[in-house]
A protein has these predicted regions:
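Nudix hydrolase/Nudix homology domain
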Residues: 56, 125-163
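Active-site-adjacent beta-strand/loop module that shapes the phosphate/pyrophosphate-binding cleft
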Residues: 96-119, 146, 153, 157
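Conserved Nudix-box catalytic region and its N-terminal flanking loop in Nudix hydrolases
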Residues: 41-81
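Acidic, metal-coordinating catalytic segment for phosphate/diphosphate chemistry
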Residues: 2-36
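A short coil-to-beta-strand element that immediately follows conserved catalytic motifs
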Residues: 85-94
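Short, well-ordered beta-strand micro-motif
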Residues: 39, 109-113, 131-134
Length: 163
């Protein structure tokens, strides 16, 4: 079950900040890099988040900061967005161009099977809802890309180059 929050003003503010950040990154960086964690438990469930600033259900994740490794960013983002601690080595599923953000954004998707849930993720200004969902009963608004990555991982098919 996922916890919910709904604050229209906060959602608008975060959307504006997200857009401003992408404009800034476009001019200040040659490329942006993000990570996503495909957190799969032994019960056949995946952890998904619904952000306050963009529609649909996604894997938890975010940007790699200057001076940070991708695995450090993944560890930080999973702790922040999912309250999940990685206890074993994540496996890189693929590196993708994410055209939804810009022509400069790349995403590293990691499969995380060894983890510990620190606490139930509560809604905040960034995450409206979060939780584990059975793979055969994903939320209706789970994004196309999220469903595609799950299909690739579960079937063993190689990932495409574009998110």
């Amino acid at each position: 079950m996922a916890a919910k929050v709904n604050d229209g003003r906060e959602t608008l503010r975060l959307r504006v900040l997200k857009r401003a950040a992408h404009v800034y990154w476009r001019f200040s960086r040659g490329m942006t890099l993000g990570v996503r964690g495909v957190v799969l438990d032994d019960g056949g469930r995946v952890f998904l988040v619904r952000h306050t600033y963009t529609p649909g259900w996604h894997f938890p994740g975010g940007g790699v900061e200057v001076g940070e490794t991708a695995l450090t960013a993944l560890t930080r983002e999973l702790a922040e967005e999912a309250r999940v601690e990685i206890t074993g080595g994540p496996v890189l599923h693929g590196i993708f161009l994410n055209r939804a953000a810009s022509q400069r954004d790349h995403v590293l998707a990691y499969v995380v099977r060894d983890f510990r849930v620190l606490e139930v993720k509560r809604p905040d200004g960034e995450i409206a809802e979060a939780g584990f969902f059975p793979l055969d009963r994903l939320p209706e608004t789970t994004t196309r890309a999220t469903r595609a990555r799950l299909d690739e991982i579960l079937s063993g098919r190689p990932p495409p180059p574009v998110w």
